[in-house]
Amino acid sequence: MSEYQYVEHEFAPVYNEESQVLVLGSLPSVKSREHGFYYGHPRNRFWKVVAAVLGVPEPLTIEEKKRMLLAGHVAVYDVIRACEIIGSSDSSIRNVVPADIKSIVAHTPIRAVFTNGKTAGRLYKKYQAEHIALP
């Protein structure tokens, strides 16, 4: 059986002064950390779905992914800054240190926050939602 590891978030949030929608995950998976960017597992459909929603070709490189997000006014980050976790198992997450979502929202015209999974949604509600004022 795998053991718990203390993991600190390795990626900066992706946003700019024009971001209007914030998509939050829980914490980058092992594969994403190996890849060096959000949603890096080859079977993850995030980039395909966002590209389809925005009506643009699916990005292949990290720089293309960042450009697509920013051009589409989409910000991406995670609700966890650090935690203990077994592998990539969201159900094993414990001892959460929440990420600073409030400062992103304070410096952007974010109008909506979406979470991309049950754990991200639960942790957003627990640690951040009450501190975020959306229009």
Please give the residue ranges for each predicted region.
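A short linear-motif detector with a strong N-terminal bias
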Residues: 1-3, 16-19, 53-57, 92-94
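Glycine/proline-rich loop-helix segments at beta-alpha junctions forming the active-site rim
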Residues: 2-9, 13, 83-135
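Residue-level preference for short coil/turn positions at secondary-structure junctions
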Residues: 17-19, 70-72, 109
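Short His-Asn-centered micro-motif
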Residues: 24-25, 77-78, 115-118
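Short, surface-exposed acidic-centric catalytic microdomains
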Residues: 31-92
